[in-house]
């Protein structure tokens, strides 16, 4: 964001301006700060204006993501090198084990890959929340594999419930509190949408998907749904895991194989999410997902 000064007669009017991408177009949102302001007044007024602008960007985000035919063809070229493979029963078991381990590890689970395999394949009895959630995520993977449900709020809540029904009192319920994500130093790196706007934003997301699911290539669709879901952050906790399940739900609906985002690549994963949040640029996410596909199906 930057401060823009516009002269009106003898007055100087100050605006905080933010540029962001909607598809391949650059859009701007500005917020009036005042006229003839001192440096001190500017610094005092900027934080609130920045917060308001970011909330406006969150509400727009992919809902203004419209591509021309030429741009759609460009995104198809990005996906073209992918070799689409269909998984057999044993492949699905291996994917479920690896996905469950990695997606939980990204969120801080201490369950090792071998332990996840024992729990899922050998039906060992779980002990503690991490092991219980391992089985919960595995059940959710099985659900997205078999369900015929359309993408809607009920499906999103169902995935959260399957993951956390035995460990979280709010499993399957949209949050009624504000949430932020902090880094290890305590700095806020992401702020979820205001909780009173969450149902409306999820409804917009599902309608956006329904409108574009035939028009846009599958990986682009899945990436946009995943990233926008993470921006909204509709649950009190567990958004990362549900978001990655939604990513795979969309891929499977379009006959693409599921994708496993690896724990060891989590820092790059976080970076592409932040680029999308701040610049509305989906290309880094697409390149990241393609790199994960190549590691998985090489």
Where are the regions a protein language model picked out?
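FIC/Doc superfamily catalytic core
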Residues: 1-237, 241-298
């Amino acid at each position: 964001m930057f401060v823009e000064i516009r002269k009106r007669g003898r007055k100087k009017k100050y605006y905080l301006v933010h540029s962001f991408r909607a598809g391949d177009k650059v859009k701007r949102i500005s917020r009036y700060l005042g006229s003839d302001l001192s440096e001190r007044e500017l610094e005092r007024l900027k934080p609130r204006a920045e917060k308001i602008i970011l909330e406006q960007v969150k509400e727009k985000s992919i809902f203004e993501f419209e591509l021309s035919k030429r741009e759609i063809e460009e995104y198809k070229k990005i996906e073209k090198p992918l070799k689409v493979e269909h998984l057999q029963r044993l492949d699905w078991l291996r994917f479920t084990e690896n996905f469950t381990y990695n997606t939980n590890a990204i969120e801080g689970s201490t369950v090792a890959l071998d332990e996840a395999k024992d729990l899922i394949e050998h039906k060992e009895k779980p002990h503690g929340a991490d092991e219980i959630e391992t089985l919960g995520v595995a059940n959710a993977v099985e659900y997205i594999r078999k369900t015929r449900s359309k993408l809607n709020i009920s499906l999103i809540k169902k995935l959260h419930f399957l993951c956390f029904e035995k460990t979280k009192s709010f499993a399957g319920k949209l949050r009624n509190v504000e949430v932020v994500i902090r880094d290890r130093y305590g700095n806020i790196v992401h702020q979820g949408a205001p909780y009173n706007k969450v149902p409306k934003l999820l409804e917009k997301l599902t309608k956006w998907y329904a409108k574009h699911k035939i028009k846009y290539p599958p990986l682009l669709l899945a990436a946009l749904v995943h990233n926008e879901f993470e921006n909204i952050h509709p649950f009190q906790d567990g958004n990362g895991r549900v978001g990655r399940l939604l990513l795979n739900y969309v891929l499977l609906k379009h006959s693409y194989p599921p994708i496993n985002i690896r724990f060891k690549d989590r820092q790059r994963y976080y970076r592409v999410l932040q680029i999308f949040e701040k610049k509305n640029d989906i290309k880094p996410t697409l390149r990241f997902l393609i790199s994960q596909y190549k590691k998985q199906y090489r």
